[in-house]
């Protein structure tokens, strides 16, 4: 711009210095000088026009660049704002993650404590189960021991079932009734043995008119051998009577032993039908002949184990072995019990 102003100043000086056109001489040298001056003026004017055009284009270009820069700047600001927002959200997430981590640690610690408590409780339960099993075994052993003792105490006893009751009964009258039974059914035994009775009575002791059947008579002999002789004689005779009416003679056993004998009832009847010659021996053992040998069984589980290797016998006793226990008395088809 300074050069252009200088040029304009120079041109103005030249114009002021040059004479007016009317005063110009018409010499060739003068005309040549005039032509050069006119060319310079034309050239400067063309330069000013072209430079202005370029400058305007340059300004427009720069304006567009500024607009683009502003747009880019706005985009950058927007990105920065979004980035800050994202960073803020990330910081919040980081804080939440830290809190969740702490909660997880707390929960893990509580879970570990619960697992320890559960493990301790399981150990206690297992110990209680072991103690319970041991206690059950001990109770079972005690019950078996008590049952054996009670059966041993009752071993000299004989139970008479179905003997009619009279209005007035006492020990002497009951002894006479027993003597009548022996004379009527076992006369040889009466001649051979001296029947010594320690005690004889009805059971239960109190009479009840509501009772449909006569109370049982319990006879306690001084020796076990006498009871066994009478039971053996009853088995041989098959039918025992008193004044022509049928009665039964059995061993006087504990309630548990009687129940164990009753549970053999269905199996006993099946084996008797198939001619296995079964017997119920003291206190509650089942015996029968299998493959030419006498087999003894103290409970059903022992019999189950035995028949697993004998398919025919297993099929024969399948239903009877799977029957549930019940307290219903099942007679052994008038087979005498010991």
UniProtKB/Swiss-Prot annotation:
Its main location: nucleus. Changing residue 142 to I: Loss of LINE-1 retrotransposition without effect on RNA-binding. Residues 1-40 are annotated as: Disordered. Changing residue 114 to A: Small decrease in localization to stress granules. Changing residue 100 to A: Small decrease in localization to stress granules. GO terms for molecular function: identical protein binding; nucleotide binding; single-stranded DNA binding; single-stranded RNA binding. Changing residue 159 to A: Moderately alters RNA-binding activity. Keywords: Coiled coil, Cytoplasm, Nucleotide-binding, Nucleus, Ubl conjugation. One of its GO terms (cellular component) is nucleolus. Residues 49-153 form a coiled coil. Changing residue 132 to I: Loss of LINE-1 retrotransposition without affecting RNA-binding. Residues 253-317 are annotated as: C-terminal domain (CTD). Residues 157-252 are annotated as: RNA recognition motif (RRM) domain. Residues 8-17, 26-35 have a biased composition (Polar residues). It is found in: Nucleus, Nucleolus; Cytoplasm; Cytoplasm, Cytoplasmic ribonucleoprotein granule; Cytoplasm, Stress granule. One of its GO terms (biological process) is retrotransposition. Polyubiquitinated, probably by UBR2, which induces its degradation. Nucleic acid-binding protein which is essential for retrotransposition of LINE-1 elements in the genome. Functions as a nucleic acid chaperone binding its own transcript and therefore preferentially mobilizing the transcript from which they are encoded. Homotrimer (via coiled coil domain). May also form larger homooligomers. May interact with DDX39A, HNRNPA1, SERBP1 and YBX1. Interacts with TEX19 and UBR2. Interacts with MOV10. Interacts with APOBEC3D; this interaction inhibits LINE-1 retrotransposition. The coiled coil domain mediates homotrimerization. Belongs to the transposase 22 family. This is LINE-1 retrotransposable element ORF1 protein. It comes from Homo sapiens (Human).
